[in-house]
């Protein structure tokens, strides 16, 4: 598709999120985020999932679609499999995008997915976030975007490639997703790995898109205010196991890191000048394996044992892995 045709027919996007309780500081920053989406141009369709206090009221105030019922795990955390499936069924956009409900977006986000969608029909767009302390409600009157962007560039901190807060993807990309709990680690890394395994173009939009993450603690979870407590929970351990669904032995043997892709694993970069191949993914792949010599040795041993197995043994091994 040519550049001219992409401006003549701009693809729409369905943004979806699952907010937490609209209480205290979390309530303030979620309202900031969602209101920023409502003023974005081109205008997205917005779907809010879940029945947390305040969600239905925010949806009604801004005229957004609200879906209260979402499948959850035994700890009451929404499952991304159901969120993504419902978003595609209910949304009208040719592009679908999950966004964490504390992320402020600007017009450059919408402009970026238009460019990527014109370039590829099978893609995932991600990008690094900029952390910023925001304690008060944002005033969206006047030139709020210019002022907030200036504050983010001046005072904010660009986060590492492991922090992934939005996923803009072509409709139908994620046809099958395991029962991963949202916000409980590993689920976001798996989404990148899955896109790469499907042969989709994974585009890092960091160089063209500024997204602002409003800093907060983790007191809204049942695990306490620190990430370390949550990572040690049964819920996060289950997420790690589920990322290995195609080969459960990978978790038992400690290889679930093979599915922990980050933004550095993107195949391409979106820049003001265009979309270019990203050589960083090669370095990331090398680093992923070279930093785990023991794991590499185990994988090599496993590969050799499979290649040397007799046909009958291979069949038994295959049945065992199912």
List PLM regions with ranges:
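Active-site-proximal specificity loops/subdomain of glycosyltransferases
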Residues: 48-99, 106-107
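Short, structured coil segments at secondary-structure junctions
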Residues: 42, 61-63, 198
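Short, hydrophobic beta-strand segments that form beta-sheet elements in well-ordered domains
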Residues: 44-51, 125-126
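Short, solvent-exposed loop/turn segments at secondary-structure junctions
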Residues: 20-22, 52-55, 73, 102-104, ...
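Short, acidic, metal-binding catalytic loop of nucleotide-sugar glycosyltransferases
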Residues: 31-44
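C-terminal catalytic/acceptor-binding lobe
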Residues: 12-14, 19, 180-322
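A short, glycine/small-residue-rich beta-strand->loop->alpha-helix junction that serves as a flexible
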Residues: 21-29
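Conserved catalytic core of nucleotide-sugar-dependent glycosyltransferases
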Residues: 88, 104-193
């Amino acid at each position: 598709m040519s550049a001219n045709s992409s401006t003549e027919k701009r693809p729409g996007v369905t943004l979806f999120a699952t907010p937490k309780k609209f209480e205290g500081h979390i309530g303030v920053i979620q309202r900031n985020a969602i209101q920023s989406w409502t003023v974005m141009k081109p205008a997205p369709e917005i779907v809010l999932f879940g029945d947390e206090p305040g969600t239905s009221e925010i949806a009604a105030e801004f005229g957004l679609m609200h879906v209260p019922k979402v499948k959850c795990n035994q700890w009451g955390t929404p499952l991304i499999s159901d969120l993504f499936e419902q978003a595609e069924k209910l949304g009208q956009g040719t592009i679908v995008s999950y966004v964490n409900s504390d992320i402020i977006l600007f017009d450059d986000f919408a402009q970026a997915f238009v460019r990527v969608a014109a370039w590829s029909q099978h893609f995932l767009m991600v990008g690094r976030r900029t952390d910023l302390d925001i304690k008060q409600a944002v005033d969206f009157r006047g030139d709020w975007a210019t002022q907030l962007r200036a504050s983010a560039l001046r005072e904010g901190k660009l986060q590492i490639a492991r922090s992934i807060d939005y996923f803009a993807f072509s409709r139908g990309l994620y046809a099958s997703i395991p029962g991963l709990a949202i916000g409980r680690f590993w689920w976001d890394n798996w989404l990148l790995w899955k896109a790469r395994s499907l042969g989709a173009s994974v585009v890092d939009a960091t160089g063209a898109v500024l997204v602002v993450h409003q800093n907060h603690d983790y007191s809204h979870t049942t695990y306490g205010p620190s990430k370390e407590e949550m990572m040690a929970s049964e819920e996060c351990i289950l997420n790690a196991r589920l990322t290995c669904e195609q080969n459960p032995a990978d978790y038992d043997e400690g290889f679930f890191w093979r599915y922990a892709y980050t933004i550095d694993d993107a195949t391409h970069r979106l820049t003001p000048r265009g979309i270019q191949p990203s050589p960083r993914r090669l370095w990331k792949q090398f680093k992923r394996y070279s930093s785990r010599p023991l794991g590499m040795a185990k994988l090599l041993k496993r590969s050799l044992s499979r290649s040397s197995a007799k046909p009958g043994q291979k069949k038994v091994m295959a049945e065992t892995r199912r």
